[in-house]
Amino acid sequence: MPAPFDYIDIGQVVGLGMARIETAVLETFIAAFTPGWTADRGAPDAMVYAIWARLDAVASTDWPQTKRLGVDALRWVRNPPVGETLRGRMTVMAKDPVGEGKGIVIAQHDLLDEEGRLVFSCLTRSLFSR
């Protein structure tokens, strides 16, 4: 789990948890948010993003992260099928102090499938307290 800004190391890798693609959840998501998509194509991109966002939100609840400044460089590599378990991880790429009480942490976030293949990736910029 990340620490205050000054104790976060570049290259540090943090697990964000796991989530399984469940049939009922996939069907409900498709009906609500991606009309025209079919479940046989796997989880739609929007659902993959939502899974990452949930894993990130739960994992970072107790972090000294005070604000998410941006999410960019989003990449979807594949649409995981029903039954697939995805694993989230965050890798600290860079950090920059901005004043006495805070600093910006730039991190790459990945969702990997059960075989360790990349499913989704993005970069984040977050403010952490020092």
Question: Where on the chain are the PLM-derived regions?
Answer:
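Short, surface-exposed, charged/polar-biased interaction segments
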Residues: 32-37, 73, 111, 130
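Short helix-to-loop capping/linker segments positioned immediately adjacent to catalytic or ligand/cofactor-binding
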Residues: 37-41, 76, 96-98
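Hot-dog-fold acyl-thioester-processing enzymes
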Residues: 1-70
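Generic structural detector for well-ordered beta-strands
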Residues: 15-20, 75, 125-127
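HotDog/MaoC-like acyl-thioester-processing domains
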Residues: 1-9, 80-130
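Mid-chain, well-packed structural core segment of small domains
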Residues: 62-91
